[in-house]
A protein has these predicted regions:
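Nucleic-acid 5′ end/cap handling module spanning
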Residues: 1-43, 123, 142-270, 274-279, ...
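Covalent nucleotidyltransferase
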Residues: 15-143, 272-293
Length: 293
């Protein structure tokens, strides 16, 4: 799986041509199509997740051919706003953590996911530059409501003025950011500065060391930096958090703080910046995962 480097101005060359597209706030997935079979694989998945996204599987089946194909993209729940996708990560998280078959079928109708494809990998396209891979993608999508290709926004030749305007627009809409990709880049199974991610928010992984109770049973998560992030936790993670062994309990102005004896969970947090004492400003919980993942 090809991964992007963090954007830095010096990584953009005025001798290269780039494509700009939206950085989607979803979950990275690959869909493998081969020999009459579809496999929907998350970035950290050990087995296919077809059962979680029946609306995606039913459309992907129609793309099966004699050729082995991998579609690289982002699973998201979103509404289209002009050239942008307004994503709802919390809604996607509820889909990701639902295991009940009846609930999955219900959510696939009430909260249908979109698989937004930004690359196509075959034995032939692996040798082609991004520009040609993007042209090939145009032949695969268009008639499917939930399976579609990423909307290219702009091509630029090292001139960052328009890229800055797009970034500000993405920031104003509360989006994740933008992607800047070299049009002549080959698909590499590694992190590469041929793809750059320019995020509106910074992002960090921090251990969850406890939680607070005030208005809700879990009002906020306490992070290892001392930051607190308010969040409505879904039932899957709420159950795991409430089963953690507690070493210390404190109470302050009506807020109960409980600290874990052995923190085992990690929070992925979006935030604007940190204070001098390392506390995050305007933190937003993006996801929770097992510490070792």
């Amino acid at each position: 799986m090809m991964l992007a480097q963090e954007y830095k101005q010096e990584l953009v060359s005025n001798t290269e041509t780039y494509n700009i597209s939206q950085k989607l706030d979803g979950a990275r997935y690959n869909i493998h199509l081969s020999k009459g079979k579809v496999e929907i694989m998350g970035r950290h998945s050990k087995k296919p997740n077809n059962y979680k996204y029946p609306e995606i599987e039913s459309e992907a089946i129609q793309l099966i051919s004699d050729e082995d194909i991998t579609l690289d993209g982002e699973m998201a729940i979103s509404t289209t706003y002009g050239t942008w996708e307004l994503t709802n990560f919390n809604a996607l998280a509820s889909r990701e953590h639902t295991e009940n078959k009846k609930q999955i079928q219900l959510l696939s109708r009430m909260l249908p996911a979109k698989f937004i494809v930004f690359d196509i990998i075959t034995n032939d396209t692996i040798k082609l530059p991004l520009k040609e891979r993007m042209e090939i993608m145009q032949n695969y999508f268009g008639q499917y409501p939930n399976l579609r290709r990423i909307q290219p926004i702009y091509n630029l030749n090292g001139d960052m003025d328009f890229a800055n305007k797009l970034f500000q627009q993405a920031y104003g809409l509360g989006l994740e950011g933008i992607m800047i990709k070299k049009l002549d880049s080959l698909y590499e199974d590694r992190r590469s500065d041929a793809w750059l991610k320019w995020k509106c928010y910074k992002e960090a992984d921090e251990k969850i060391i406890g939680y607070t109770s005030k208005e809700r049973q879990i009002s906020a998560l306490i992070l290892e930096s001392g930051s607190k992030v308010n969040a409505i936790i879904d039932d899957y993670w709420k159950d795991i958090i409430l089963k953690q062994d507690i070493s210390t309990t404190k109470e302050n102005t009506g807020e109960v703080q409980r600290y874990f004896s052995k923190p085992s969970l990690t929070a992925v947090i979006k935030y604007l910046e940190r204070t001098d004492n390392n506390i995050m400003r305007f933190p937003i919980l993006k996801e929770i995962r097992e510490k070792e993942a």
